[in-house]
């Protein structure tokens, strides 16, 4: 009987859903921060007289910070623990969000957005691998997909802020920026309610602490369900109780070793494809709607409709990922995204753009639900946070490039050309997943990574 077998046999119940809520709120505010910038751009442009190129740099600031934050969070998460990184990242993000709100000029605002993005990126990269280590294999796809679904609530909140706060007050865009710092209020709750990952504790040789976490979770699950716990199954794969020290060089060496190179290449490409397409679309959709002849306020209303389509996208993909595997779910939703992006490229009225944009929003965000479930599953525990962080960081290269590329090329390519480019990127992702993706549904984290452990010995 192993500690992790005891953990994996627990039925999902109130203690798991509390973890889902805690992590989900983190993703809600990450999503809000990522999306709100699109609604700040017109006001910032008017106040500081910014060019389209400068607006593109602001749009790229948060994902640029995400890149560094995700990389650092992964490395630290495998060294000092997932919980500490989550809390430090949240505080860092909130401080620089407030600084951005009171920025006196473009330069200070840009730097503050980059640093706030680093905090948000660190938090975002660590939540999914952290919580995936608490969830039984048979429900992990749904759980992490639903966790990622909280991003959609943040985007809807951003759209509502853009519609009702930004145009209502003289400094509405600054007030909106202050609102993004509110998650600082969650710190005390997180400190009291979040346990450290027992898988991380075992890897660090802290078996007594891991036992305490699992025993406490067992007690709470039994109390919540009012039933005896299921029997502990025999396990074929034992967890390792020691691991190499992780730094950036050793991590990259392992991730691109023969045992891991295929997995790493597929995951990194998927992250690049989805973030390039996602940020290229959502960073510019209000501005593109304005350029199609509607008012800024009306463009924000259309954006709310588009953002609302994210919610069923996330949760439908979370449901499907347990039934047709993460790999197939990602391929299906990427294909839907490609078709939707092409459809959007052919539209020329605000209403048809909004409808096509809502469908694209549904499929893009469904893809994200699959990706957030899939990524932590392919890396061993000792490097799970680092692997997830580096994958997310590489994806942020796409999100950095997309707003700037679209901002600079929209004049020459036009509306159709911009989304034609997005279609081509998405098609490449579909082919990659279908041909090279790994099936993961219903398998324990230790089983999925058993063969890769040989590369560390």
Language-model features, listed with the residues they occupy:
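Transmembrane-helix signature of 12-pass secondary carriers
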Residues: 1-457
């Amino acid at each position: 009987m192993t500690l992790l077998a005891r953990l994996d046999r627990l039925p999902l119940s109130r203690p798991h859903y509390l973890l889902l809520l805690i992590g989900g709120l983190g993703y809600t505010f990450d999503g809000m921060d990522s999306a709100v910038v699109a609604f700040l751009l017109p006001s910032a442009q008017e106040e500081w007289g910014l060019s389209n190129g400068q607006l593109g740099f602001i749009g790229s600031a948060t994902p640029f910070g995400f890149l560094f934050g995700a990389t650092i969070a992964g490395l630290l998460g495998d060294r000092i623990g997932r919980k500490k990184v989550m809390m430090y990242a949240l505080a860092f993000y909130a401080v620089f969000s407030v600084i951005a709100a009171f920025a006196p000029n473009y330069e200070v605002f840009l730097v503050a957005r980059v640093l706030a993005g680093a905090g948000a990126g660190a938090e975002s990269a660590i939540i999914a691998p952290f919580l995936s280590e608490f969830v039984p294999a048979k429900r992990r796809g749904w759980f992490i997909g639903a966790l990622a679904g909280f991003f959609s609530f943040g985007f809807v909140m951003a759209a509502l802020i853009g519609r009702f706060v930004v145009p209502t007050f003289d400094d509405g865009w600054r007030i909106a920026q202050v609102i993004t710092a509110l998650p600082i209020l969650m710190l005390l709750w997180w400190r009291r309610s979040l346990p450290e990952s027992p898988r991380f504790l075992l890897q660090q040789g802290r078996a007594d602490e891991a036992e305490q976490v699992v025993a406490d979770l067992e007690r709470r699950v039994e109390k919540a369900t009012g039933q005896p716990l299921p029997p502990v199954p025999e396990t074929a794969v034992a967890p390792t109780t020691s691991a190499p020290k992780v730094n950036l060089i050793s991590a990259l060496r392992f991730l691109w070793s023969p045992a891991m190179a295929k997995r790493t290449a597929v995951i990194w490409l998927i992250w690049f494809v989805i973030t390039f397409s996602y940020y290229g679309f959502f960073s510019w959709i209000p501005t593109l709607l304005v350029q199609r002849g509607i008012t800024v306020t009306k463009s924000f209303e259309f954006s709310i409709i588009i953002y609302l389509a994210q919610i069923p996208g996330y949760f439908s993909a979370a449901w499907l990922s347990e039934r047709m595997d993460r790999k197939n779910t990602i391929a299906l939703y990427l294909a839907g995204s490609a078709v939707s992006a092409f459809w959007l490229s052919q539209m020329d009225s605000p209403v048809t753009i909004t409808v096509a944009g809502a469908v694209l929003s549904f499929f893009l965000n469904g893809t994200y639900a699959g990706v957030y479930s899939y990524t932590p599953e392919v890396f061993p525990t000792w490097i799970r946070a680092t692997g997830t962080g580096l994958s997310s960081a590489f994806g942020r290269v796409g999100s950095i490039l997309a707003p700037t590329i679209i901002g600079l090329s929209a004049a020459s390519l036009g509306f159709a050309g911009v989304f034609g480019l997005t279609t081509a990127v998405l098609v490449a992702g579909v082919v990659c997943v279908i041909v090279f993706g790994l099936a993961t549904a219903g398998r324990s984290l230790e089983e999925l990574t058993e063969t890769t452990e040989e590369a560390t010995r």
